[in-house]
């Protein structure tokens, strides 16, 4: 009897070894966040970059959550941010004091100036983070900010916005946080 079906067609190849994501040390995160402030607190772009990176590290948010964040998603009095995640899932995450201070400084000094730069007839009033032209910041801009700030901080390992998310989770777990709780953040 001849075999007419390829019995090996249903067999799946074993998965290759997955690599662990790049994670910054606590010292590298500190250097990154310090480097974001280089250029002075009066420059609205510097103020925005510092607030953006503090926000991303403090919340462990995805880039899309940072770019999609609106002013009314932030409660600085309660130290809480409302994030809209994948699948339109909303979650509340705590905002640390460093992030709250950086966001407050940005809102008090930088954001208004960036909003005034808009050439649009109706300025962007909702977005938390604005680009140099007063519009909602893009994913690409966030990537460029993270990369440029990492270079200024002397960080040589691969660095991208998601690295902050991985670092956030890793540092929480290293600090004793429950893995299930971190997964929900």
Regions found by a protein language model. Give the residues of each.
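Conserved catalytic core of the tyrosine transesterase superfamily
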Residues: 1-185
